[in-house]
Swiss-Prot record:
Predominant location: cytoplasm
Pathways per UniProt: Cofactor biosynthesis; pyridoxine 5'-phosphate biosynthesis; pyridoxine 5'-phosphate from D-erythrose 4-phosphate: step 2/5
Official protein name in the record: Erythronate-4-phosphate dehydrogenase
Compartment(s) where it occurs, according to its Swiss-Prot or TrEMBL record: Cytoplasm
Family (UniProt): Belongs to the D-isomer specific 2-hydroxyacid dehydrogenase family. PdxB subfamily.
Annotated Gene Ontology cellular component terms: cytosol
Alphabetic keyword roster: Cytoplasm, NAD, Oxidoreductase, Pyridoxine biosynthesis
Active site, per annotation: 209, 238, 255 (proton donor)
Residues noted as binding NAD(+) in the record, renumbered to the chain: 146, 175, 233, 258
Binding site residues for substrate: 45, 66, 259
Biological processes, Gene Ontology terms: pyridoxine biosynthetic process
Catalytic activity, reaction form: 4-phospho-D-erythronate + NAD(+) = (R)-3-hydroxy-2-oxo-4-phosphooxybutanoate + NADH + H(+)
Top class in the EC scheme: oxidoreductase
The encoding gene: pdxB
Length: 376
């Protein structure tokens, strides 16, 4: 089997070479001519997989190591008899910890307490649901908005978007990008909705897809003095994002919210397992076999873990401000945005840190937040 794999998938050769001959390539450089002779294609979100890319090729299996599939024409793949697999939820932990770290950063910067703010979660799939659980574990009030989920789920009280934006202090977006239908999300956050935000300061976080927010309308609102702190990990027209918008947001990063090492390996192994099943050569790999020891493995903490202590623990693992600085320094360089993603550090998840505490309440809370905590 010949397998073409995006170079941003960690351990790609080590993982997929068990199933065939592997060729590594930049995801944006995959063309119909290049892919035509391969049996399988393994991609991330920067590669649009559709009829124009694959028609007439030998490809019989497509895997995306991402949780979203708006870059995949899965209907055409099914019609063409091409097996498709993706890694739903593989990066949920990473995105949730990015958002939590962002909130801890802003609470420090602007002098508020998270438990005094209400977080509106827009989109309650794998990521939104996990964020809801972790915020609740820390005692942060939440509101939920997801019309499709509201019809089938009972995890909480559901709000209409128009009501949520007037009541929540924080709006964090976790929807897929869809252009059609009753619940289309393209430009979900638009000029009208931004105008409807209360005059008191609000926070907007987008880690799903850039076009869920109308970037032009957002920039216009910020330039007009809208009291809005903005954290953007995703942008319209990536990698050619609006420099004016970047200059007006609190934190900007290069579409790396889901880029934990655990999340990327989790996604790759999900596709590996599915492809091996497709080939009838059943093999199974575990994430832990590919993870190196973290830089900091264990800390001891005395007493109750409050917001300041949680912030210190989160900062031990991930420095969000550094990613913001890197984007601002490199965005003017040729291919700067993509280079940041290609050469991204081995960011770890909170579960990589063991925390010994002498307080049972702290131990339980830290475990609910994703750390490994033991009572000592």
């Amino acid at each position: 089997m010949k397998i073409l794999v995006d170079e941003n998938i960690p351990y790609a050769h080590k993982i997929f070479s068990r199933l065939g001959d592997v060729q590594i390539i930049h995801g944006r450089k995959i063309t119909a001519q290049i892919v035509s002779s391969y049996d399988a294609l393994i991609v991330r979100s920067v590669t649009n997989v559709n009829q124009s890319l694959l028609e007439g090729s030998k490809v019989r299996f497509v895997g995306s190591t991402t949780s979203g599939i708006d870059h995949i024409d899965d209907h055409w793949l099914e019609k063409s008899g091409i097996k498709f697999s993706y890694a739903a939820g593989c990066n949920a932990i990473a995105v949730v910890e990015y958002v939590f770290t962002a909130l801890l950063l802003l609470s420090q910067r602007y002098g508020f307490h998270l438990r005094d703010k209400t977080v509106g979660i827009i989109g309650v799939g794998n990521i939104g649901r996990l964020l809801y659980q972790r915020l609740n574990a820390f005692g942060v009030p939440t509101l939920l908005c997801d019309p499709p989920q509201a019809e089938i789920s009972t995890i909480g009280e559901w709000q209409l978007l128009e009501k949520l934006v007037t009541e929540a202090d924080v709006l964090t977006l976790h929807t897929p990008l869809t252009y059609h239908g009753r619940h289309a999300t393209w430009h979900l956050i638009n000029e009208d909705l931004l105008s409807a935000l209360p005059s008191t300061k609000r926070i907007l976080i987008n880690t799903c897809r850039g076009a869920v927010v109308d970037n032009v309308a957002l920039l216009h609102a910020l330039k007009k003095g809208k009291l809005l702190s903005v954290i953007l990990d995703v942008w319209e027209k990536e990698p050619n994002l609006s420099l004016s918008l970047l200059n007006n947001v609190d934190i900007g990063t290069a579409h790396i919210a889901g880029y934990s090492l655990e999340g990327k390996v989790r996604g790759a192994i999900k596709i590996f397992n599915d492809y091996s099943k497709f080939l009838g050569a059943i093999q199974s790999l575990n994430v832990s076999a590919f993870l190196p020891a973290p830089m900091i493995e264990y800390v001891r903490w005395h007493g109750v873990i409050n917001e300041e202590e949680l912030r210190k623990l989160a900062y031990l693992i991930y420095d969000l401000q550094f990613d913001d600085i890197l984007l601002r320094r490199n965005i003017h360089k040729p291919h700067g945005f993509d280079q940041l993603r290609t050469n991204y550090c081995e960011r770890r998840e909170w579960s990589s840190l063991s925390v010994g505490t002498d307080n049972n309440i702290s131990t339980n809370m830290l475990n609910q937040l994703g750390f490994k905590s033991i009572l000592i």
